[in-house]
Curated annotation (Swiss-Prot):
GO terms for biological process: cobalamin biosynthetic process. This is Cobyric acid synthase. Transmembrane segments: none annotated. The lineage of its organism: Bacteria, Pseudomonadati, Pseudomonadota, Betaproteobacteria, Rhodocyclales. Gene3D superfamilies: 3.40.50.880, P-loop containing nucleotide triphosphate hydrolases. Residues 253-441 form the GATase cobBQ-type domain. The keyword Thylakoid does not apply. Coiled coil: none annotated. Catalyzes amidations at positions B, D, E, and G on adenosylcobyrinic A,C-diamide. NH(2) groups are provided by glutamine, and one molecule of ATP is hydrogenolyzed for each amidation. Keywords: Cobalamin biosynthesis, Glutamine amidotransferase. GO terms for molecular function: ABC-type vitamin B12 transporter activity; catalytic activity.
Length: 492
């Protein structure tokens, strides 16, 4: 397959709509019978997924694979950076941990990372009719241009055309598009075939003069203006977006809260709770009062000791004691599970200097962080009722031991037991991400938390419906013939 059948979607900013547009195009193409694969050369994200080949990739690429109706694979995201501090990250190459590097050291490593990127891209180019590539952040970050492998550096190396997407909802869309284009080199500018504007609300006729000006100013077409799709619920790539903090609902019965630590990871684990019509779910950020709740969920963390210290500084430790004293329930997932134990040891300095810290003491377990990361997709049943199906995945470097493990949270199909339940039955911990991803597990866990007779939420069905809704919008509002014709004129 010629590399001309690849198209790269770059954005004027982070959260401009790159991931969404790639997912929508992928679903639209696969519905036409086209074999298409997603690809992101380098992703920096704390939300990740486990692939069928036993590796780890960004969650956005896993979602795009679902959109393309193929199994997620490590080639879809060959370089994943998981920040562990403001100046360093865990570097994952082809799904496996390579090292923890500072920003300066990673910059020196980029030529090696680029080789991994090109190897994955070449494999995908040989297997699929089209490859839809997603950039990262903005291609016009001047300080990141040297040795760039995420945006134009990759586009130049792979010789692929580019479409620029911008979010009109945040304002300044014309300045974003024109400014980005003008900050590119002449050869990079020549790759940009045109634009897509995302999240438009209002009368398109009032926008048309601006679109005409943009085409006249740049000599490039606007391929489409995607509307603001209210209620679209797709897996977030990384940080919690505005509007995801609270989910007030009339008629909500169960109050659920979760802290937003600095290095929160895989917060998508709680999506089913945020969608549940009988759950009043709230993220609690730094400096915010900790409200009363029926259930507290401690989500995953990339830097467990540091986020545990943050919890203490924010007053969560006494709040959890009060919560349990008055009969509340607590669930800890992965890093949150580790925090609930009596001690957390990092003898190899995986998260900083080697150290051992006291946990919250809600579970009788001790955790030691080990060098080898566990990456596996699993299925099983909740031990609470022995019946509710669970389908999730493990991404962790900790090994836990202790008496409360004798009361597991989940019984896995491979014969293992996972997690722990406290002696009083109020605290549950598990290493399984995706704990709430099946309707049966949602119903059983909410029943345990106090919402008797709770209904389930089918997250997979909702995801499929929203991907089709997104693809419908792409088909209706993006001139796909013009887009792909401009990208691949020889194939038109």
């Amino acid at each position: 397959m010629s590399k001309a059948s690849a198209l790269m979607v770059q954005g004027t900013t982070s959260d401009a709509g790159k991931s969404t547009l790639v997912a929508g195009l992928a679903r639209a193409l696969v519905r036409r019978g086209v074999r298409v694969a997603p690809f992101k050369p380098q992703n920096m994200a704390l939300n990740s997924a486990v692939t069928a080949d036993g590796g780890e990739i960004g969650r956005a690429q896993a979602l795009q694979a679902v959109a393309a109706r193929i199994a997620p694979h490590t080639d879809f995201n060959p370089v994943l950076l998981k920040p562990s501090s403001d100046i360093g990250a865990q570097v994952i190459i082809h799904g496996k941990v390579m090292a923890n590097l500072s920003a300066r050291d990673y910059h020196a490593y980029k030529p090696t990372a680029m080789a991994a990127v090109m190897a994955s891209f070449d494999r995908l180019s040989a297997q699929y009719e089209h490859v839809l590539i997603e950039g990262a952040g903005s291609p016009a970050e001047i300080n990141l241009r040297d040795r760039d492998i995420a945006n134009m550096g990759f586009a130049e190396a792979a010789d692929v055309p580019v479409v620029l997407v911008a979010d009109i909802d945040r304002g300044g869309v014309f300045a974003h598009l024109v400014g980005t284009l003008e900050l590119l080199s002449p050869s990079e500018q020549a790759r940009v075939r045109g634009f897509v504007i995302n999240r438009f609300r209002g009368d398109i006729a009032l926008l048309q003069p601006g679109l005409d000006w943009l085409t006249e100013r740049t000599g490039r077409p606007v391929f489409g203006v995607l509307p603001y799709l209210h209620g679209l619920f797709l897996d977030a790539e990384d940080a919690l977006a505005n509007g995801q903090v609270a989910a007030d609902r009339d008629g909500a019965v169960l109050k659920v809260i979760a802290p937003v630590y600095p290095r929160i990871s895989n917060h998508t684990d709680l999506d089913a709770l945020r969608l549940h019509p009988q759950v009043d779910f709230r993220w609690v950020g730094p400096g915010q009062a900790i409200p009363p709740a029926d259930l507290v969920v401690l989500p995953g963390s990339k830097s467990v000791q540091a986020d545990l210290a943050w919890l203490r500084a924010q007053g969560w430790e006494p709040a959890l004691r009060r919560h349990l004293r008055y009969g509340g329930k607590v669930i800890g997932i992965c890093g949150g599970f580790q925090m609930l134990g009596s001690t957390l040891a990092d003898p190899h300095g995986l998260e900083g200097a080697p150290s051992t810290v006291a946990g919250l003491g809600a579970l009788d377990i001790e955790t030691v962080l080990e060098r080898e990361k566990q990456l596996v997709n699993v299925r099983g049943r909740l031990a609470l009722d022995g019946e509710a199906a669970v389908a999730g995945y493990e991404i962790h470097m900790g090994v836990s031991r202790g008496a409360d493990l004798d009361r597991p949270a989940v019984l896995l199909e491979d014969g293992r037991a996972d997690g722990a339940l406290s002696a009083d039955g109020q605290v549950l911990g598990t290493y399984l991400h995706g704990l709430f991803d099946t309707p049966q597990a949602v119903a059983a866990l909410l029943d345990w938390a106090g919402l008797k007779g709770a209904a389930g939420v089918d997250l997979n069905a909702r995801r499929e419906a929203d991907l089709d809704r997104l693809a419908d919008a792409v088909e209706a509002h993006v001139d796909m013939a013009a887009l792909f014709g401009a990208a691949w004129p020889d194939a038109a």
